[in-house]
Design a protein with these regions (language model features):
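Membrane-anchoring hydrophobic helices of lipid-metabolizing enzymes
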Residues: 2-135, 140, 170-175, 308-321
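Short hydrophobic segments within beta-strands
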Residues: 134-136, 160, 207, 245, ...
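Short, highly selective alpha-helical patches that border small-molecule cofactor pockets
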Residues: 144-145, 231, 342, 346
Length: 368
């Protein structure tokens, strides 16, 4: 167990008035959440999510695009709106309940969360091998920070996380989690310390389903996107096993943590990109169990103002895969000589990535 003076603890920082105000608000929110039962809080969160769906059209568009990619590109209209509204309801409810989960005792936690896949999760650690946990941002995600309550036989459990911008909140959350037996490793601190823990037979959680520009560009639900290679990298270097993990809603105020989905690397070519593809497949299997419990309010398949970096080995891996297209719309000039000048560019675009689909808009006279 670590403490606030350990090498992985948050660095000292000058606290501003805004930091103190934010901390006061955080503590006030926690105090209020303690007064509300979990089932009631979940229902209140759903009501707040329904309101947010109407008030946040930009976020709604993001959620609906993500759901079309995951479920069906043909989804439109009322059916899609119904799904996105339900996702908003669950997301806000899960957010509020996650905040309350941090305040629960271990016994209270066990009344709210059921763990599945106990043996698959614990087996490698009990045999002295590390266990990398590729985590999906879904359901009551705070339950995973408290997972040691369900695994007394697992002596060391750690989590990689992004530090809070507010140093007071950072110190508060860090100390609470470490006091409960979870070792915290900030992403800003590098991978040396978490790697050491894995090699010593610990279990390490890594959030693995967010867009990462500096990552490897491999398919997630059939569409290429920036993906963190960190879980695959840690597994390979530490000689560890891996499970994909997600939390899904079972009933109002109750969740199931699926802990036993062992990631199969037998189809991988052994490259970092190949291994990351298998990590994504493991996450996809769990997410399909409860798509609407996933946090979809972010650009998981973000379109950026430049083409994704790609190496030849990764490109070769993707060549034989069935991928959803990356679409580019090209508007051709009316003047014929100017239109002809765009042909080399259009041909070049087709070679940039194997999932490229170039759609051309041109005057009818230029067809043929």
């Amino acid at each position: 167990m670590t403490d606030s003076s350990s090498p992985d603890s948050p660095p000292a920082s000058r606290n501003t008035f805004a930091h103190h105000l934010g901390m006061k608000g955080f503590l006030l929110m926690e105090g209020l959440l303690k007064l509300v039962g979990m089932k009631t809080l979940y229902r209140l969160g759903r009501a707040a999510g329904a309101v947010a769906w109407h008030l946040l059209p930009q976020r709604r568009n993001i959620v609906e695009r993500n759901l079309r990619i995951v479920l069906d590109p043909a989804l439109r209209g009322k059916e899609l709106q119904k799904l996105s509204r339900e996702n908003f309801k669950r997301t806000i409810a899960n957010f509020l309940c996650s905040a309350k989960t941090a305040t629960l005792t271990d016994e209270q936690l066990k009344h709210c969360v059921t763990v599945g896949g106990h043996e698959q999760f614990a087996a490698p650690v009990l045999e002295g091998r590390g266990q990398v946990c590729a985590i999906a941002h879904s359901g009551n995600w705070e339950a995973l920070a408290r997972i040691r309550a369900f695994y007394p036989e697992v002596e060391r459990y750690g989590s990689m996380y992004r530090q809070f911008d507010n140093p007071l909140m950072e110190e508060y959350v860090y100390q609470r989690r470490t006091e409960r037996g979870t070792q915290m490793f900030s992403k800003e601190g590098g991978i040396k310390a978490p790697m050491k823990m894995l090699k010593e037979g610990g279990a390490l959680g890594v959030l693995s389903d967010q867009f990462v520009w500096e990552g490897v560009y491999v398919p997630f639900f059939g569409k290429v996107t920036g993906t963190t290679p960190l879980p695959a990298l840690l597994r390979k270097r530490a000689g560890a096993d891996m499970v994909a993990i997600a939390v899904r809603t079972d009933a109002p105020g109750h969740w199931i943590a699926d802990m036993g989905n062992v990631v199969d690397f037998s189809r991988s070519d052994g490259s970092l990109a190949g291994d990351t593809i298998e990590v994504n497949r493991g996450l996809e299997t769990l997410i399909r169990e409860s798509v609407l419990d996933v946090f979809w309010m972010h650009h998981r398949w973000k379109s950026v103002d430049r083409f994704a970096p790609q190496d030849k080995k990764t490109a070769a891996l993707l060549e034989n895969m069935e991928l959803k297209p990356y679409r580019i719309l090209v508007a051709v000039p009316r003047a014929l000589d100017e239109a002809l000048a765009t042909v080399p560019l259009i041909r070049a675009l087709k070679t940039v990535r194997c999932d490229m689909q170039v759609n051309i808009v041109c005057p009818s006279a230029q067809l043929g």
